[in-house]
Amino acid sequence: MGPLTFRDVAIEFSLKEWQCLDTAQRNLYRNVMLENYRNLVFLGITVSKPDLITCLEQGKEAWSMKRHEIMVAKPTVMCSHFAQDLWPEQNIKDSFQKVTLKRYGKCRHENLPLRKGCESMDECKMHKGGCNGLNQCLTATQSKIFQCDKYVKVAHKFSNSNRHEIRHTKKKPFKCTKCGKSFGMISCLTEHSRIHTRVNFYKCEECGKAFNWSSTLTKHKRIHTGEKPYKCEECGKAFNQSSNLIKHKKIHTGEKPYKCEECGKTFNRFSTLTTHKIIHTGEKPYKCKECGKAFNRSSTLTTHRKIHTGEKPYKCEECGKAFKQSSNLTTHKIIHTGEKPYKCKKCGKAFNQSAHLTTHEVIHTGEKPYKCEKCGKAFNHFSHLTTHKIIHTGEKPYKCKECGKAFKHSSTLTKHKIIHTGEKPYKCKECEKAFNQSSKLTEHKKIHTGEKPYECEKCGKAFNQSSNLTRHKKSHTEEKPYKCEECGKGFKWPSTLTIHKIIHTGEKPYKCEECGKAFNQSSKLTKHKKIHTGEKPYTCEECGKAFNQSSNLTKHKRIHTGEKPYKCEECDKAFKWSSVLTKHKIIHTGEKLQI
């Protein structure tokens, strides 16, 4: 095989032929020429850049009116033959066949006149009248590269059988010199190499972002246009990528074909299984250059980096709130629509996020696969284990820029920030009351519905919040696991300990704008404000008396019911209120009440 020139891998058109091509076909020509040139360079064949390539890279018209021919480089000789021992001929064929046949095979220009090279392809009976002119010309390039002439058909068969064989044997003879990753075909290695070279040929006119592939640019443009051409027939939801629609459909079918060999858990996406496997290995390959923190997912690292930059590019058109991630914006939008598309098959409860449904489903199974290595405590969600681990480390990585206060969780920091802004985006449709947290709105709604789904197994008392049930349970055990380091006093709940600590510091960060009075708890400030507004939203259904606090209404109701939940352990006497029980106990202790 003799020395090659760039002309050997270029396609030539006459002026008449060039004028027959439409814009799409001319762009196709440009892509093929650039692709062929890059493949030759990547294969290690040194060549000075032809005028044609320079012209195409600059986006200029390839036809020269003076010369009346396509600007093909002068016969620059490649510095060497294709070295058969370094680059097996068969795989070189694979590379160019992928470019010329597979990727550019459907141009549909029926009456394009052909030059000699294409006629020779007809002699080989490669295209029995079914292919169009431009495709034939592209295939002619391949003929020139491999010097097949009349045996191109045989070369195709051999190439395809070899490629088929590689799939079954899983041989990966082509190795990336940059990162060591191996591939079965040289075309795949060529595509992969762009990751290292960062060669971006397709630029977005809207934002300037560049991409290696025109198809990737096309997908990216949909971010700006908002186009969502792929629609789910089941629920009508639309997507900007077909792959996202395929993933979404599995929600309706419940299909989970990907199984973890370690624990047997199944997933509806292969990527989710891959992510899950890292739980078993403990591997954290993605490290933050800013603070050194490591993560098991690249997406988590990307999200984490925004802590350092403060970037929030995704804005809600409804209320103006900005988010670091597009997924968070999507989740947030459901607040405005009230939509709950994710339904539990066991109990029928609906959720606005698939993650919330997954969290809920564990209630029915009772499964707790995530165990803490420090104390052995098990959790039903990996996120809960992560949250729990901070108890052992004491780490508080999330700091408020406004006041310097640090928090263990980003969600707690987000909630805290609202103290400074005073924002209350969550409004009750029933009574128009607004809240700074969606969870508080959910809790509040139960006042109107009267729903109390959380029941104590000991005494049968029901609560509208799970946290209230947890607190109540401790009244049966008298357990006080949270101890003050300053005075040694024990508390049943960490929140009570936090409130107690302020006694020692004297801090009162919550100030009334009306009268200037300061409080050590936000709840006390909220209660105090009602003095100025005169608001009494809690009304007794029995007698119509109104109260400014729900706790006062609860106490008042006991007058009508006769309920006496506070019992003296010493003499079994019962009382309506805990304060009266406290006073009563002094009779038994002999302690003198301080007035």
Swiss-Prot record:
Which tissues is this chain's protein expressed in? Widely expressed, including in testis.
Give a Pfam family name.
KRAB
Read off the SUPFAM superfamilies from this record: beta-beta-alpha zinc fingers, KRAB domain (Kruppel-associated box)
Give the main location.
Answer: nucleus
Q: Which SMART domains does the record associate with it?
A: KRAB (SM00349), ZnF_C2H2 (SM00355)
In the record, what terms sit under GO molecular function?
DNA-binding transcription factor activity, RNA polymerase II-specific; DNA-binding transcription repressor activity, RNA polymerase II-specific; RNA polymerase II cis-regulatory region sequence-specific DNA binding; zinc ion binding
Q: What does this protein do?
A: May be a transcriptional repressor.
Q: What is this protein called?
A: Zinc finger protein 85
**Organism whose genome encodes this protein:** Homo sapiens (Human)
